[in-house]
Amino acid sequence: MNAELSAETREHLEALERGFAERAACDIGDGGPDRGAHVDFDVVLAGGGLSLVYAAYLARRGLRVAVFDRRKIGCGHREWNISRGELRPLIDSELFTEAEVDALVQLEYDHGICRWHGGGTYPVRQVLDCVVDAERLLDGLRARAEAAGATLIDHHALAGYRVGAGGVEVRLSPAKTLSPAKTLSPAKALSARVLVDGMGAASPHAAFDLVCPTVGGVLTNLLDVDPRVGEILVTTEDVEDDRQHIWEGFPGPDGRFTTYLFYYTEPAQLPPRPLHALYERFFATRPRYKRGEATLVKPTYGFIPAYSRLRPMPAARDRVLLVGDAAGRHSPLTFCGFGSMIRSFLPVADALRARLDEDRLDARSLAKVWREPPGLAVMGGLTLMMVPGRRRSTDPRDVNKLLDAAFASLGELGDDVYGAFVRDQIGFSDFIRFMRATAKRRPSIYDEVFSVLSPSEIARWSWKLGGLALKKWSSG
């Protein structure tokens, strides 16, 4: 692995693993600005990745915005795919023109597939079929935020904050580095009316009970690549070390291929140095997925958190709003965080502006900024069934068999249902059709639900499924 990854990449892997392990150590409490006290900003945004879209939009609407990140703001370490129609909010927000959004799309596939070891291959159209130029998107968001007057603070991490009746005081510390040659800038303190947490898995507030360690990169010189096909989910082996490893891969321009290896687990079950360990497996097993003497052009990695919604939410705080992966606003089954963020940022940002105008920034009011689609919890129940450690079966083929039955059913139901499932948007009627079709292929599915989920999780899952049904009936 050392020959494959640069010193800078290894340093950032260490920082990510340390930040994830220490996420709960943030110093949080009361004693912030009193009512009527001057504050520096309307919004302080923690995290300068894709959540930068909030900074650009809110600053353009006249709000005083500051952003900080432990790395350089706008420096991403993921590649993204999305369907073309889901990019529309970038245009509707007036952050980008149609021509600029078109320029962000590097490649468009004919279709995508999901393929399971020992099972079948199931194609779907208009799902994750556009390759987005992540660097160009983030550079554009940073430039737009700066042009609108946002204050950007690179290489600083959240040390803690204090909430008061008049605002929140946010304390920043220089980001830790393994390179002694790098000069650390001084600690900083900011005050704002609201703190927006877009820190993903490193967030001290992150609402997740599942986590998905993910490693990979942009590679060249691979064989077995069809530039017309995106590989959404693929397995090449059964459960090993109590984990079902899954690949995804997307052809890019100029013969490049972006691929990830990941698995689903509960945070307490993570091994030591999980990203390093997974990279070792990535390099060792990648030829089973794609042959060729590949060259790693750009490493991509991280922790993707997910919240099943079948366990109680962590307690919310006044004047703190979670966005993106930190809020778990995507299906824990498909982990389409990029699409979820782009779909949701505009209504969430407008709702936040309204709360600021009304000075309603208590936890209850901020919780209503985003209304959770009932279908997310339904997906959460299925995700828990994919965590091998929760299953009674010791058959290493079991998870692949479950996935094959599920996706064979989606393929049978057609692109609309299949696509809605992957995009977190499946409705009640289609979900029931999906479960019935899956049960025909795998009659044990209902027994598995009751064996994997606890009584309280089953109760919450049933309640959320009822909410999905109510949404259908109330809409006619």
Where are each of the predicted segments found?
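Extreme N-terminal leader/targeting segments of oxidoreductases
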Residues: 1-42
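C-terminal helical "tail/cap" subdomain of flavin- and related membrane-associated enzymes
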Residues: 10, 14-21, 350-476
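Short, well-ordered coil/turn residues at beta-beta hairpins
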Residues: 47, 196-199, 323
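Glycine-rich FAD pyrophosphate-binding loop
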Residues: 48, 57-79
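N-terminal FAD cofactor-binding segment of flavoenzymes
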Residues: 75-113
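Short beta-strand to alpha-helix junction loop
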Residues: 122-143, 214-217, 268-274
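FAD/FMN-dependent oxidoreductases across multiple families
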Residues: 131, 267-380
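Predominantly flavin-linked oxidoreductase catalytic cores and closely associated redox partners
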Residues: 148-287, 345
